[in-house]
Structure formats: structure tokens, C-alpha cells
Swiss-Prot record:
Belongs to the intron maturase 2 family. MatK subfamily. Disulfide bonds: none annotated. This is Maturase K. GO terms for biological process: mRNA processing; RNA splicing; tRNA processing. The gene is matK. InterPro entries: Domain_X, Maturase_MatK, Maturase_MatK_N. One of its GO terms (cellular component) is chloroplast.
Amino acid sequence: MEELQGYLEKDRSRQQHFLYPLLFKEYIYTFVHDRGLNSSVFYESTEIFGYDNKSSSVLVKRSIIRMYQQNYLIYSVNDSNQNRFVGHNNYFYFHFYSQMILEGFAVIVEIPFLLRLVSSLEEKKIPKSQNLNLRSIHSTFPFLEDKLSHLNYVSDILIPYPIHLKILVQILQFWIQDVPSLHLLRFFLHEYHNWNSLITPNNSIFLFSKENKRVFRFPYNSYVSECEFVLVFLRKQSSYLRVTSSGAFLERTHFYGKIEHRIVVRRNYFQKTLWFFKDPFMHYVRYQGKAILVSKGTHLLMKKWKCYLVNFWQYYFHFWSQPYRIHINQLSNCSFYFLGYLSSVLINPSAVRNQMLENSFLIDTVIKKFDTRVPVITLIGSLSKAKFCTVLGHPISKPIWTDLSDCDINDRFGRICRNLSHYHSGSSKKQSLYRIKYILRFSCAXTLARKHKSTVRAFLQRLGSGLLEEFFMKEEQVVSLIFPKTTSFSLHESHIERIWYLDIIHINDLVNYS
């Protein structure tokens, strides 16, 4: 018990105070601007309404001055809710100020977690280059390839999200004791949740929209991280349980370290359940709200884990989690979708003839191999939702891009095609990507033909296929840019060999679209 108390005190000592005054510092918003986030208000909102980006600094200073006024933000939200369709400029100023505060607030509340990460890396003396490599999504697959071939069962878990927003704020109270900051976060969650209901019927979509995902995914990821503490706690209490967990945070802003510190409550409650959770081969991997739990144990053990997780979410977070969100399957008989790949364990039986003196006999052996493939049907569904093709996979034009130049249209389609090829370089059968490339290629041709008011056939006959070829770099050319010419690696083997890159720090948008 004394060890548990010391563990809690160590975590609590790292809680940061007085974060709220940083909202009034101009350099915070300059830092947000310099980071160049894709969803930053400095780049998107000003362009939507026709304002110049250079005026952002002026608006930042004006907003900081107005924030000193009492209840300014509350009056602004109420006024915008009542008169949002009256004035274009008033709506822009409210939108800009609120988004600016959201961006700055998101950076500020991340400070305690970034400090913990830096101190953890310094204590473990992990080189910076190695830390960057661990951030790559592809670094997860060599781990799975090494471990899954020796395991039996897998639990495919969809982590539920809490219905009430106050649960997210209550979780952050363990890490941040700055009361004004927590009140401000609760205010944003409440007001924006109601304000967006005028636009989007499904309020849960707003919490994860691209415009506000940075600040609203922060409490959500804290909640997911809190869900994982039970796994780490059981590992610490049982010498036989070894759990490895890496969590991703906000695409480019990650909790990219090994998770080791969690709040622990009611130790007596866990002591009654430790005995049937002991498993020398238990591994856990998560990305966003999707997780897999693999084990060498029996099906009964996996059912106990499922029952425990459902009850844990119900009694600890006070909401019901549907049991169907956890699927238990045998690795040798199923495939599971994770990180944009359809993964499975293939069994290759073989017979070896052995002869000893005058006697000969056959030895049957089974070789297990971890296999990753491209989920073509899922990708076609994502392309259909993005309006690149029909549901059946027939390419269609992209009318919204017809106002761009021919070079920009080719560049956009080519970039999408190369990114998909780069992300799925670890597939054992890259030929399945040919259909995806075909859809993008002819969607690009159909878009260009629509722009020039011509047919696809006439457009290609007039300009030739070379116009499209240069924007679709082959996988061999990508590999040749990475491996030196003196290497013994054959470029023709790139269609067979799996290649995992260490520069992919977020999942492809089309892969994550479905």
C-alpha cells in the first residue's frame, strides 16, 4: 500500500498550476501560428471569409484586449447564437476569436503532458532520433509481425466514448488543477455543443470535426488514456502480465511514449480479479478509438477480459458500453482491420521427410506468418464518400476541383495516389492497389475532361497519357529514392517484400475516412 501511495504522489507532483494566465500572452498564439497546423484558424478561417493572413496578428491583439473585459466571451457566444444570420462580419469576428482561443487553449493544456514526456525521455536517456522513429505508425507492424504469429486469440475493441461531456472534464482534473482552465474547457464543450446543434443534427460529429479536433480530442484522448490505466496497473501488480501500449494523439500531436503512469483507485477491487488475468503472452496496441488485445491464452480468458472491460467502463465512467463493440476471434481463422491494413495470421503446412538408418518417416510442420493486405473494398468505400468514384468503384469527375489549373488537378490526384502507395508499402500483395490507382487516374482524367468540356477519350487522345503518367510515381521509383544504388535490394522485389517506413506519423486521410 505504501508503494501505491508513493506512486500516486509522484504523479500528482507533476500536475501544473496557473495555466489560465497564458491565454493572455501573445506569444502563445504566435507559437500556434508558426506551427502551421492544417486546421488552424490562422490559415483556414481568414481565407474563407476573404481576409488577409497578415491581419491575424492585429486580430490577436484585439482579442486579448477584449478578453480582459468581464464576461466578454459569454456575451459574444450568446450574441452570436441569437444573431448569427444577421451580420457577416460579426459572425466572422466571433468565429475567429473563438477559434483562436480554442487553438491557444489546446496548446496550453498540452504543456503538462509535454513536460512529462520530456522528463521521461531524459530519465530513460532515449535518443531523439529513436523517439522519432517510435512515432511512426509503421513501427507498430514489425512488433505485430514478431508477436502475433505465436498467439492464438485477438480481441477487436472499439473504445466507447462517454455520452456526457462532464466525464471528459472530470478526468482532466487528475492532471490539471488549474480551476479557471477547467471551467473554460467546460464552457467550450457546453456552449459549442449547443451552438453547433443549429447546424449539425448529430452533435457527436462536432467534437471530432477537423475544425476543432485539436482541443476537443484532447479530453477525449485523456479519457482513452484513462481507460488504459487498468492494463498498466495489472501489469505492475502481476509479474506475469506484460502489456505494451502506445497511444496516438491528434494525428500530428501525439502521446507517443510508452504509457506507464496512471491514476489507480480501489486496489482491493482489483485484487479479486488478478488471479484469472495472468497471462505470460498478452499484448495491447491502440490507435485513436480502435484497439486490439491479443493473447496466447484460451477463449475463456478472452471472454473474461471482455466482461471485465465492459463492467469497468460501466462502473468507473458511469455509462453503458455495448458488448458487441468487442469481438473475440481466433487468429488462424479470421482477419482484423487495424491501421488501414487487413491483417491475419496465415498457416502454411509442410511435410519434411526424415530418414534414420533404414527407417524413414514424415514430419508435419506448421509455419505461421503474419500477413498484411490492402482492404480494397474499404478503400473504394472511402473513395466513394470522397466523391472520386461510385459505390461500385466506377471513376467519376471531381466537379469542385474544375476551377483549379490543370497542373494543380494533376498534382492533387498524383499526391493522393503516391500517399496511398507509400502508406500501403507494407502490403504483401501490392497488385491490389492497381484498382485504386485506376480509379484515381481516370477520375483525374474525367475531371480534366469536364473542365475542358470534352469527353475522357477525346481528351486523352488529344493530350496523350503522358500528361497523367508523370504524376503517378511508381513504387519502384519511390524505393529507388530511399535505397542507394549499391544495395542488393532488387526493385522488382518491392511488389513482394513488405517495406515499413519510419516517417509516417499519422494515418492516411482516405484510410481513416471510413
